[in-house]
Amino acid sequence: MALSPRESAAKRAQRVRTRLKSLANGRPRLSVFRSSKNIYAQVIDDERGVTLASASTLEAEGKGADKDAAAAVGKLVAERAIEKGVKDVVFDRGSYIFHGRVKALADAAREAGLNF
């Protein structure tokens, strides 16, 4: 029986997260969630189970869900993570392909000083 779209996305996200665990080496992960109206990013320390920094289009300058708003979120989450002393992260794209808004967020976070 074929998987539903929700089950397929969960399976993709789990596959990505499993690979990240082997690559992390104690680094926190930059997790991205994308909805039709907003984009959210968090820097999460999985060893302690704590969110170190977060940002979304709900609070960033560019409200909405376009590439410019995603870039603003990437810059904001990177600045907040660097304030907390986090410079090295692993990028968790979840079930999303590395394209469009997700790529814009990642590029802006790299430009703002995060290494991944």
Curated annotation (Swiss-Prot):
Entries under InterPro entries matching the protein: Ribosomal_uL18_bac-type (IPR004389), Ribosomal_uL18_bac/euk (IPR005484)
The keyword RNA-binding appears for this protein: yes
Keywords: Ribonucleoprotein, Ribosomal protein, RNA-binding, rRNA-binding
Annotated SUPFAM superfamilies: Translational machinery components (SSF53137)
Ribosomal protein found in the keyword field: yes
GO biological process, one term: translation
Pfam name, any one: Ribosomal_L18p
Assigned GO CC terms: cytosolic large ribosomal subunit
UniProt cross-references to CDD domains, sorted A to Z: Ribosomal_L18_L5e
GO MF term list: 5S rRNA binding; structural constituent of ribosome
Family in the record: Belongs to the universal ribosomal protein uL18 family.
UniProt function note: This is one of the proteins that bind and probably mediate the attachment of the 5S RNA into the large ribosomal subunit, where it forms part of the central protuberance.
Quaternary structure and interacting proteins, as annotated: Part of the 50S ribosomal subunit; part of the 5S rRNA/L5/L18/L25 subcomplex. Contacts the 5S and 23S rRNAs.
The protein's name: Large ribosomal subunit protein uL18
Species assigned in the record: Caulobacter vibrioides (strain NA1000 / CB15N) (Caulobacter crescentus)
